[in-house]
Amino acid sequence: MQKEIDRIKDIENLILDSTNLKMLLLNPLSIIYGIEQKKGDLREIYTAKINNKIRLYIKPIGKFPYNVIEITELEFLKIDNKHYGDG
């Protein structure tokens, strides 16, 4: 469990080090952490990979559709492990 907590802290630090959502998404660490926008009804949400089973849901503060340059604040919504099987 400590590994997952450390990963969440690393993702939080990456977000804090990014000046806006665009810089976060362009950062190569975003690929390592699997930060990506959801599709369909959840397209307002971004997720980050905590491990093979657990995803962190992240929502930009602002109105959708987002201007990725203007978004400077994100909130952690929840941690989800129900759709990814054994991790």
Where are these regions (language model features)?
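Enriched for short, Lys/Arg-rich terminal
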Residues: 39, 46-87
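A generic signature of intrinsically disordered, low-complexity regions enriched in glycine/proline
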Residues: 14-17, 21-24, 84-85
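Compositionally biased amphipathic helical and low-complexity segments enriched in hydrophobic
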Residues: 15, 22, 43, 75-78
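Arg/Lys-rich, positively charged N-terminal/basic patches that mediate binding to nucleic acids
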Residues: 1-15
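A short, surface-exposed loop/turn module that caps and links secondary-structure elements
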Residues: 20-46
